[in-house]
Swiss-Prot record:
Species for this entry: Thermotoga maritima (strain ATCC 43589 / DSM 3109 / JCM 10099 / NBRC 100826 / MSB8)
Catalytic function, reaction form: [(1->4)-alpha-D-glucosyl](n) + ADP-alpha-D-glucose = [(1->4)-alpha-D-glucosyl](n+1) + ADP + H(+)
Family in the record: Belongs to the glycosyltransferase 1 family. Bacterial/plant glycogen synthase subfamily.
Keywords, sorted A to Z: Glycogen biosynthesis, Glycosyltransferase, Transferase
SUPFAM superfamilies: UDP-Glycosyltransferase/glycogen phosphorylase (SSF53756)
GO molecular function: alpha-1,4-glucan glucosyltransferase (ADP-glucose donor) activity; alpha-1,4-glucan glucosyltransferase (UDP-glucose donor) activity
Name of the protein: Glycogen synthase
Binding of ADP-alpha-D-glucose, residues: K15
GO biological-process terms attached to the record: glycogen biosynthetic process
């Protein structure tokens, strides 16, 4: 089975969010399950910068190629590399006009960029003769590929047996643009209807992918159910309900080689489930590095997140003053909306012995927090899958979450009777319930030491690997092939 896996960001070539982690790991595990997978992504400016840092080579294999169907004079080059730690070939669509910004999600025109990339990807596939059985696209930036295949390429024998899979990593980002982009894309007018890409007078790229893909999945079973409701459906719940028979939920995994406290080169002291006492050495070193009072007995709660409303930060901001009354230090890492960045900076000024606000993106510090914290905070308003809670569990750091989406599928409330469970959480979206969940975690941390150790071992022994997920994706690909009569 040949799969072309298309993503706008792939770790370690270019990373902004969790999509890059998925796209940089799932293909490795698909390969282990016998799938002949090839990655295609844009050649962002950061790709060359990261080559030395992450030890990969990149070379040009074709140049000055025209883009079919799109109304543009822009050409593209093709570059090639290999995904580090694997033998997965990765091809890059290179164009300095569209992909030279410092930020992966910046540039002269995001709509044009996505259209150019989608169309160029199909030209790349033909130019390199990749002959895919499956084209697997991710999120709105790549969602027009199934639209192209079902319309302007419908009678092209090269793609006649190719099936499409769309993975929705976050329904909140849809790629909504002026209808004029339809003409630029070279797509037929008939797709601009309520049953196609039309969306409240605009053009919705993700909706196009939902309508035209053979099968669709999102990144947890609970989120697949939630997005078919008005509350979580982001105005696409109707079309998702129409496609419900072709909509699946597959939990993401994490890369066990990359995220392993026994070998992680970024953390202060390596440890494993049989040497948990070494985890506290990481806490002491973290406190020292961040200028917090050093005390291995004091509970440390970590928050590593984009600082945006989706992440439930309004709840956390509401209860921060109360949380500082506990014997608790709170370490924040992330960037995002100015209101949250400023709020956490002010909390640090007000409570310098209690709060460390690190308003930046820092992979190394993130790993140190996963290893050094006792508790991991994730009170999300919604969470398609979430990786932070998985990373924290892998490192024996206990998640306190709102039970939604993938958080509900991965974190199980600890039951002291059965001694089963991996964390603590709450369902109702309000700050009082968050405070209650943190209080419960702190009760076990300070007063039920044996139970706390059991929760840590439960969390670290939970199977969160990509191996499990990859098997489910292989089954999904078979369902997609059945849709095209194969």
């Amino acid at each position: 089975m040949k799969v072309v896996f298309v993503s706008y960001e792939v770790f370690p070539f270019a990373k902004v969010g969790g999509l890059a982690d998925v796209a940089g790991t799932l293909p490795k595990y698909l390969k282990k399950h016998g799938v002949d997978v090839t990655i295609v992504m844009p050649k962002h400016r950061i790709v060359e910068k990261n080559a030395e840092k992450f030890g990969y080579e990149i070379k040009k294999v074709a140049e000055s190629l025209s883009v079919s169907h799109v109304k543009t004079d822009q050409k593209f080059d093709i570059y090639e590399s290999v995904l580090p730690g694997s033998d997965v070939k990765t091809y890059f669509v290179a164009n300095d006009y569209y992909f030279s910004a410092e930020d992966v999600y910046a540039g002269p025109d995001l709509g044009e960029q996505a259209i150019f990339f989608c169309a160029a990807t199909l030209d790349l596939v033909k130019h390199l003769d990749l002959k895919p059985d499956i084209v697997h696209v991710n999120d709105w930036q790549t969602a027009l590929i199934p639209v192209y295949l079902k319309t302007v390429y419908r009678d092209d024998p090269y793609f006649s047996r190719t099936a499409t899979v769309l993975t929705i990593h976050n329904l909140g980002y849809q790629g909504v643009f002026d209808p004029k982009y339809l003409s630029f894309a070279g797509l037929p007018d008939y797709v601009y209807t309520i049953d196609g890409l039309e969306f409240y007078g605009q053009l919705n790229f993700l909706k196009g992918g939902i309508v035209f893909s053979d099968v669709i999945n999102t990144v947890s079973p609970t989120y697949a159910e939630e997005i078919q409701t008005e509350e979580y459906g982001e105005k696409l719940d109707g079309v998702l309900r129409m496609r419900s028979k072709d909509l699946y939920g597959i939990l993401n995994g994490i890369d066990y080689e990359l995220y392993n406290p026994a070998t992680d080169r970024y953390i202060y002291v390596n440890y494993d489930v049989n040497r948990l006492e070494l985890k506290w050495e990481n806490k002491v070193k973290l406190q020292e590095e961040l200028g917090l009072p050093v005390n291995k007995e004091t509970a440390v709660a970590g928050l590593i997140s984009r600082l945006v409303p989706q992440k439930g930060l309004d709840l956390l901001v509401d209860v921060m003053d109360y949380l500082t009354l506990f014997d608790l230090q709170i370490v924040v890492l992330g960037t995002g909306d100015e209101q949250y960045e400023n709020a956490f900076r002010k909390f640090q000024e007000r409570y310098p012995d209690k709060v460390s606000a690190n308003i930046k993106f820092d992979v190394e510090l993130a790993q140190k927090i996963y290893a050094g914290a006792d508790i991991f905070l994730m009170p999300s308003r919604y969470e398609p899958c979430g990786l932070g809670q998985m990373f924290s569990m892998r490192y024996g750091t206990i998640p306190v979450v709102r039970y939604t989406g993938g958080l509900a599928d991965t974190v199980k409330e600890y039951d002291p009777q059965s001694m089963e469970g991996t964390g603590f959480g709450f369902k109702k979206y309000d700050s009082a319930h968050l405070l209650k969940a943190v209080s419960k975690a702190l009760h076990f941390y300070y007063r039920e030491k044996d139970h706390w150790r059991r929760i840590m071992t439960n969390a670290m022994n939970t199977d969160l690997s990509w191996d499990r997920s990859a098997k489910e994706y292989v089954d999904l690909y078979k369902k997609a092939l059945a849709k095209v009569g194969r």
